[in-house]
Protein backbone atom coordinates (compact mmCIF):
# COMPACT_ATOMS: atom_id res chain seq x y z
CA UNK A 1 0.00 0.00 0.00
CA UNK A 2 1.07 3.59 -0.47
CA UNK A 3 1.01 4.18 3.27
CA UNK A 4 3.37 1.25 3.82
CA UNK A 5 5.74 2.63 1.18
CA UNK A 6 5.71 5.98 2.98
CA UNK A 7 6.54 4.28 6.27
CA UNK A 8 9.46 2.40 4.71
CA UNK A 9 10.73 5.49 2.91
CA UNK A 10 10.51 7.43 6.16
CA UNK A 11 12.74 4.88 7.87
CA UNK A 12 15.31 5.05 5.06
CA UNK A 13 15.37 8.86 5.29
CA UNK A 14 15.68 8.68 9.08
CA UNK A 15 18.77 6.46 8.96
Curated annotation (Swiss-Prot):
Recorded GO CC terms: extracellular region
An individual GO BP term: killing of cells of another organism
Compartments, record wording: Secreted
GO molecular function per UniProt: lysozyme activity
Catalytic activity: Hydrolysis of (1->4)-beta-linkages between N-acetylmuramic acid and N-acetyl-D-glucosamine residues in a peptidoglycan and between N-acetyl-D-glucosamine residues in chitodextrins
Main location: secreted
Tissue specificity comment: Expressed by the venom gland.
Enzyme class, UniProt record, top EC level: hydrolase
Keywords, ordered alphabetically: Antibiotic, Antimicrobial, Bacteriolytic enzyme, Glycosidase, Hydrolase, Secreted
EC identifiers of the protein: 3.2.1.17
Keyword Secreted annotated: yes
Presence of keyword Lipoprotein: no
Record function comment: Lysozymes have primarily a bacteriolytic function.
Protein family per UniProt: Belongs to the glycosyl hydrolase 22 family.
Protein name as catalogued: Lysozyme-like peptide
Organism: Tityus stigmurus
Amino acid sequence: SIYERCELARELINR
